[in-house]
C-alpha cells in the first residue's frame, strides 16, 4: 500500500515539474534567443554595425546606438529570467550568493558610468559594454544545462571559423569589409585584417586565447577538427597583426605541446589515428607553405616584426604623460581635457597601449585599483566554475589585454572571453551543475 501511495505522489510531482505547452514554447524561444545573443556578441563588431547604419564606435549619432545590441539582449534575457522565476528575489539572491564577483563587476561598471557623467567625460557607454555586460554573462548562464551550453559552443566555434576565414580573405584580397572606424572614418594606413572582431588587436587577443583554450582541451571538437582549427587560427592570427599575441601563443602553446609530447612518450602509447594524421599533415606541409608564400603570408609576418608603426615609441611616450600630471590628480582622476591634450602632444591619438595606464590617466589610481581588483575576482570566479585547463587562456588574456588600450576603452572583449571560458570549459556534472 505504501508503495502505491509513493508511486502516486511521484507521478503527481512529475506532472507538476513537467512544463506545459506554453512554457515549452517559451523555453524554446529562450534557447533561440540565447543562441542569437551569443552570435551578436561574438560576431557583430562596430564595423559591422556601421554597415548596418549604427555609429557604435563614434561620438555622433543617437545615445542608444552607443551600446552593443548584445548588451540590450542580455538585459532582456536577465529580465525574462526574473519573470520566469515567479519571485524575482530568488534569482537575485542566487546571483549575490553564487556569483558575487560578477555582481561586483557589473556594479563597478554602473558606478564608473555615474563617475564619468559627474566629471563631464565622454564615452559613457564604454563602462556598460566593457564591465556591465561581462558581469551579466555568468549570471545569465548560471545553471544552464549541457544542451544549452553545447549550442552556445557551436555558435562560438562557427563565428571563430568565419572570423579566421574572413581575415585570410582580407589579406589575400587587400580589402577590409568591417574595419575599425571612428565616426565612420577608417584608418586607411592600417592594413591589418579586421574580420568580424573590429579592432585588429582585440581580434588577435581573442584568437590567441581561443587557440590556447583548444590546445588545453577546451570544447567538444574531435582531435582532427581541433588540430585543423588550431592550425587555421594560427595562420589567421598573423593577419590580425598582433605581435604580442603571436609570440604569447607560440610560447605558451609550445609549452603545452612539449608537456603533451612528454606525457605521450612516457606512456609509450601513440594512437594509430594520431600517427596517421601526423604523417598526412607532414605530406601536406610543403603544399601549405607554398600557398602561404604565394599569398604573401610570410611577407606580412616579417613586416609585423620589422616595422611596428611606432608602437614601441608610443609605449615609451605614454609614460612621459605622467610627468605632466600632479600625483594628487593621478590619485583622484586627472582632467579629461588635459589628458586628451597630452595625448595629442605625445602622438598618442591612436590610444595608450596599456589598459591599466590608460585607466589611471582617465579615471585615477583609486578607481583603476578597484576595477583591477573587480576584474581579477571576476576571472577567478569564472575559472572556479570551469573545469581544468582554463588558467592558460586566462594567463594569455591578462598578458595581451595590457598590450593595447583593451579594457580601458569601450569593448566587448571581456564579455566574449568569459563566454568562451564558460562554454569551452563547462564544469563536470560531479561539481553540481544541473
Which stretches of residues belong to each language-model region?
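A membrane-periplasm/extracellular boundary helix in multi-pass inner-membrane enzymes
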Residues: 165, 172, 257-306
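Transmembrane alpha-helices of multi-pass inner-membrane enzymes
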Residues: 78, 212, 391-401, 408-434
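N-terminal signal-anchor transmembrane segment
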Residues: 2-87, 112-114, 398-402
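Aromatic-anchored transmembrane helix interface
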Residues: 99-110, 119-144
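Alpha-helical transmembrane segments of multi-pass inner-membrane proteins
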Residues: 153-177, 195-259
